[in-house]
Amino acid sequence: MPFINIKLVPENGGPTNEQKQQLIEGVSDLMVKVLNKNKASIVVIIDEVDSNNYGLGGESVHHLRQKN
C-alpha cells in the first residue's frame, strides 16, 4: 500500500479543500502512471504545518515571512 505524506505551510488561507482534493487526485494518478500502483490502495495524507513549527536557516518560517 503506497503511503504519501504531503506537508504544507499554508499561506494566505490556502490550500482550499478543493486544492487538497486536486492534490490527492493528482498524486494518486501519478503513482498509478509511474509506478503502476492500484489507485484503490494509495493513501495520501496532507499535513498543514504551522509556520511557527517549521524553520529554515535557523529561523522559523513565521519569522522569515514577517521580515519580508
Swiss-Prot record:
Signal peptide: none annotated. It is an enzyme of class 5 (isomerase). The keyword Isomerase applies. InterPro entries: 4-OT, 4-OT-like_dom, Tautomerase/MIF_sf. One of its GO terms (molecular function) is isomerase activity. The active site is at P2 (proton acceptor). Keywords: Isomerase. Pfam families: Tautomerase (PF01361). Its EC number is 5.3.2.-. Belongs to the 4-oxalocrotonate tautomerase family. This is Probable tautomerase HP_0924. It comes from Helicobacter pylori (strain ATCC 700392 / 26695) (Campylobacter pylori). The lineage of its organism: Bacteria, Pseudomonadati, Campylobacterota, Epsilonproteobacteria, Campylobacterales.
